[in-house]
Curated annotation (Swiss-Prot):
Origin superkingdom: Bacteria
Catalytic activity: heme b(in) + ATP + H2O = heme b(out) + ADP + phosphate + H(+)
Protein family: Belongs to the ABC transporter superfamily. CcmA exporter (TC 3.A.1.107) family.
Protein name per Swiss-Prot or TrEMBL: Cytochrome c biogenesis ATP-binding export protein CcmA
Any single Gene Ontology cellular-component annotation: plasma membrane
Lineage: Bacteria, Pseudomonadati, Pseudomonadota, Gammaproteobacteria, Pseudomonadales
InterPro entries: AAA+_ATPase (IPR003593), ABC_transporter-like_ATP-bd (IPR003439), ABC_transptr_haem_export_CcmA (IPR005895), P-loop_NTPase (IPR027417)
Amino acid sequence: MTLHLQAAGLACERDWRLLFEQLDFELGAGDMLQISGPNGSGKTSLLRLLAGLMQPTAGQILLGGKPLAEQRHALASILLWIGHAAGIKDLLTAEENLTWLCALHQPASREAIWAALEAVGLRGFEDVPCHTLSAGQQRRVALARLHLACPPLWILDEPFTALDKQGVAQLEAHLAAHCEQGGTVVLTTHHTLERKPSGYRELNLGQWAA
């Protein structure tokens, strides 16, 4: 399907507090949307809404012109979600984690998994239990999924967390390349992006912050 994600009159309330309202935007192939704003402004909540993990207080999200809530299967087939936490199992190795994560959507070969780990600078760590890795290395294990056979829509919550300078530069380049190849990225980050695709834009939720 051709990716077309639309937010119409979107509002979100958490703990009796309005985070944002009347949000309208559209996303398609090649777009990158950076969601910014102070802590507590609803950045993660907006990501979760777009990923179908929450329901809006008002308004709606459309996928291909149809309500997102009616298209769970279609969304799952095009979405890669990586939350703020690495989301990996400490007792599994880096390879085992990626094998398990990929099996939930599209299984990947051992060769592909090793290549993905090499792409994020973890060559030689394939058989290392993740509880022995640093926070940055654990984050890179999670981000290695972006180098496997991936769906077009990436929704990423603070993907640069715990990465060193080289890791940040590599991830920036990979996200931009994904968009330039027709993919779509929605992300939150406090990091100032140095490399932005032509379809980049920013949505600041700060105007609703108390």
